[in-house]
Amino acid sequence: LNSGVGGFSPVRWNDLLGAKVGDGGTANERKTRMKVLVACEYSGRVRNAFMAMGHDVISCDFLPSEDDSPYHFQGDVRTVLAEAGPFDLMIAHPPCTYLAVSGLHWNTRGVLVDGRPRAELTEEALDFVRLLMNADVPRIAVENPVSCISTRIRKPDQVIQPWWFGEDASKKTCLWLKGLPKLEATNRLPGDDKTRRANQTPGGQNKLGPSPDRWKERSRTYQGIADAMAEQWGGLVPGGEMRTIQTGEQECLHFNPRS
């Protein structure tokens, strides 16, 4: 699905998810399913982690999906929320360009971006974060690095590190949670926050040098974190109710896969 394709329609779960629906059981086995939106994700890592658990998942971003998945909407998340809801769970990765503390010093120096004050773009980015946090979804996780979200909206519920989840990397990642528990470390590597990781120079800086794609490379969710989100949040059901389907019989609203 891309931004040029409008509308959503019901499709059978077994047609949409294929063998994933029936894996590990008979055709009549009833399983819990959640409808999940992964907002502002082009890599597909979080989407695919939840899909591997058998959930009904769509990602969206203004960029196309790197894996050319049919379960990606290239466009505005507001369109998805308005036309494809309700969702049980949303995980959002709002762009951090004008939010991260590492760049906020430019806001006080009169820097212009395409003729607009950078500080103005920070305000717009904060408004977008508020929109995501206040979306009509019972369970929400908003992810960002250390940013002005903490001082302008509220402090994060949790700050995690990739090396808690088996990734030899250091990157403080903040989570603002609604209706979700904190993530538990799954494979904490030896060391602490002072330990130099594979993605760092001896001075503690990120090894990725300046390039047009640096922001893109750094914005990908680490696989260990994506897997932990799917494993720990994928079994939760909003409102204490079980959302179940009967394989091959129940129909559910979803995006039409592109042809």
Locate predicted features.
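Conserved active-site and SAM-binding loop architecture
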Residues: 2-259
